[in-house]
Amino acid sequence: MAPIALKILLFTSLIVPSISLSDQARNGHARTICEVKPGGSSEIDDVPAIVDALTTCGSGGRVIFSNNTYHINSVMNTTWLDDVEIDLQGTLLWSTNISYWLNHSLPVGYQNQSTAWILGGKDIVFEGHGYGTFNGSGQTWYRYVGSTSNYPRRPNQLTVSGAMGAVFKGLRFVQSQMWTMSIIHTSNSWFDSIYVNNLYDDGGSAQNTDGANTIYSKNITLTNWEVVNGDDSISTKANSTDITIANCTFTSGLGIAIGSIGQYNGAFETVERLKISNITYEKTTHAVYFKTWTGDQVGYPPNGGGGGLGYASDIVATNLKTNNLKGAPFTISQCTTFSGASGNCTNSKFQIRDLVFTDISGTTDSSDVASFQCSAVAPCEDITIENVSLRIAGNTTHAEEYLCGNVDGTVGFNCTGDVCVGSSATGGC
């Protein structure tokens, strides 16, 4: 193993990055600064140097990645951070050793998902200046997994776990291995000016390349994101509360997802107080869509499950701009079940209620504004849709259809027909 390269610097030698960083730690002492020196070769794993820097300067200090490439050849678990500033000026490049990652990826703690890096702690500032980059070498993964959904042990790129008062800003994520970012057991944190591009160079959809997933988290703000991918742009999953998504542009993916949820038999989960505003959609499938598992447990996560309890409520989306949406902007499906099985779309005990969608305009490929495939056991309640101006791309007609199944209480629209009941997780057939 190459020797660990770690350089201790005085604060006065550092050019202060673009966000407001302090030369003093929370305790009033001057910050210790660690600059990670790259090994300079893909054969040299830079993880030992990174972990050493975060150990030395991870409490009241600053860790600097210079404008170089750092080779990430092994997993990282750095959850002890406290009042630390991480300054990424270069690129973190993950290796393409699929066998290693499948055998060593770390558990996320939800849906049997795995990850390459778990990062957590208190008062973390992670600054990328708009060019600091995570490169997951995703093309190798997209070819390897093919059409297999949730390939076992395929890692998320970054998991923010147990963080409080964190700020992640100006980071670029390209070619993520799977989900770009999972945010779990985290609170009072801000993720701003994040760029994600997970397109598959060989064509087709790079599935499971979500921009971000919130899980068991509260008071999370995601602003000024740009996501180009083949799956959920951003997803709020189990026990996500007080989440704000604003001033974002989403391209090519499925749109903002609530779920999937209701996957664990008998478990009570919620998504509450989600605020979505000022979003631009470029050729996504939907604007906002809901996906819950059926009332029957078939198999186990990540590709099986069902029978979960709970509700999604107090969800508001406003000021949405679309360019050639592929499907209805607002959909609900309660049909998710084991991969390859046909689910019962009407027996979920997970309820969806108190939704407000206002001020959506642009173009769409669908004549449907909404497709709500709700459970008969726990019908959807109190849905408002107002100020819709969606022109069907290529002509002058407008989307005016509202398809409903088991919906009680509508404001601003009337249901115009029955929803197509099918096993699609995205509310269509």
UniProtKB/Swiss-Prot annotation:
Disulfide bridge positions per record: C374-C380
Catalyzed reactions: Hydrolysis of terminal non-reducing alpha-L-rhamnose residues in alpha-L-rhamnosides
GO molecular function: alpha-L-rhamnosidase activity; polygalacturonase activity
InterPro entries for the chain: Glyco_hydro_28, Pectin_lyas_fold, Pectin_lyase_fold/virulence
Root EC class: hydrolase
GO cellular component: extracellular region
Lineage: superkingdom: Eukaryota
Gene3D superfamilies (UniProt xref): Single-stranded right-handed beta-helix, Pectin lyase-like
Any coiled-coil regions, as ranges: none
Subcellular location: Secreted
Keywords assigned by UniProt, alphabetized: Carbohydrate metabolism, Cell wall biogenesis/degradation, Disulfide bond, Glycoprotein, Glycosidase, Hydrolase, Polysaccharide degradation, Repeat, Secreted, Signal
Annotated PbH1 repeat ranges: 217-238, 240-260, 271-292
Sugar attachment sites: N67, N77, N97, N103, N112, N135, N219, N239, N247, N278, N344, N387, N395, N414
This protein's record includes keyword Signal: yes
Signal sequence, renumbered to the chain: 1-20
EC number: 3.2.1.40
Pfam families attached to this UniProt entry: Glyco_hydro_28 (PF00295)
Active-site residues, as the UniProt record annotates them: D231
Upregulating conditions: By rhamnose and sugar beet pectin.
Any one of the GO BP annotations: polysaccharide catabolic process
Protein family membership: Belongs to the glycosyl hydrolase 28 family.
Primary role: Alpha-L-rhamnosidase which is able to degrade p-nitrophenyl-alpha-L-rhamnopyranoside (pnp_Rha). The natural substrate of this enzyme has not been identified yet.
Name the UniProt record assigns to this protein: Alpha-L-rhamnosidase rgxB
Native organism: Aspergillus niger (strain ATCC MYA-4892 / CBS 513.88 / FGSC A1513)
